[in-house]
Amino acid sequence: MAEHIIVTLDGPAGVGKTTLARNIAEELGIAYMDTGAMFRSIGWKLGNVVESVPPAEIEKKLAGFRFSLSGAGAATQLSLNGTPVGDEIRTEEVALLASAVATLPVVRTFLKKTQQKLGSEVSLVAEGRDMGTVIFPAARYKFFLDATPEERARRRYEQLTAAGETPDLKALTDQIRKRDHQDRSRVVAPLRPADDAIIIDTTELDVQGVFAAIMSKLK
C-alpha cells in the first residue's frame, strides 16, 4: 500500500483485537503494532514493584527501553532492545501487571511517544486501549470492539485449554472484570471509544464476521 495509513482497533481484553489486527495488516500489506504487548513487556520487565518505585526511577528504566517493528502483516515482529518479544508476556499475571503500569503517567507518556514515532515511520494497524483517542486521534479509520465479559472469558478459556492448560472459567471471568474496571476507571486515558470510532459488538460474531465488517469500511 503506497498511501500512508493508520487503522486503530481499541477495546477491552478478549474481543479479538490481536487476531483481527494481524489479519487486517496482512490484507493491507502493512505493519501490525501490538500496543498491549508493549505494556505487557514493560510490566514484565518492571515486575510488581511499580507501586513502590518512585516515578523518577521508573523513568530512568524506561530510558533504556527501545521498541522496534520489523516485517508486515502477520509476520510483523515487535522487539524490545533488539530482542523479539515472545510468549513470556502472554500470562494472566503479566496481563495484570500491564494494566497496573498502564495507570502510570510516566509509562503512558513514554509509550505514546514511542508509538507515535513508529506510526510516523510506517503504515500500520494499531490495536490497544486508546489508539483512536490518545495515540492516533487523527487516524482516518478507527474501530472500537466490545463483547460481554462472559464471552471474552469463554474465548480465553478455549485458548488456554487448546494450549494444554487447565484454566478456571470463573477465575478468568473475575480477572477480566477486574481489568475492565481498572481500564475504564483510570484517570489517565480510560478505556472508551473515540467519538468518531465505528463500534462493533463482537459477542455474537466470529473473527471472519468482524473482519468482513471492518474491511468493508476500509475499501
Swiss-Prot record:
Binding site for ATP: G11, P12, A13, G14, V15, G16, K17, T18, T19
Catalytic reaction list: CMP + ATP = CDP + ADP; dCMP + ATP = dCDP + ADP
E.C. numbers: 2.7.4.25
Keyword Aminoacyl-tRNA synthetase: no
GO process annotations (BP): pyrimidine nucleotide metabolic process
Subcellular locations according to the entry: Cytoplasm
Main location group: cytoplasm
A cellular-component GO term for this protein: cytoplasm
GO terms of molecular function: ATP binding; CMP kinase activity; dCMP kinase activity
Enzyme class, spelled out: transferase
Keywords noted in UniProt: ATP-binding, Cytoplasm, Kinase, Nucleotide-binding, Transferase
InterPro entries per the UniProt record, alphabetical: Cytidylate_kin, Cytidylate_kinase_dom, P-loop_NTPase
Family affiliation: Belongs to the cytidylate kinase family. Type 1 subfamily.
Name this protein carries in UniProt: Cytidylate kinase
Species for this entry: Oleidesulfovibrio alaskensis (strain ATCC BAA-1058 / DSM 17464 / G20)
Lineage: Bacteria, Pseudomonadati, Thermodesulfobacteriota, Desulfovibrionia, Desulfovibrionales
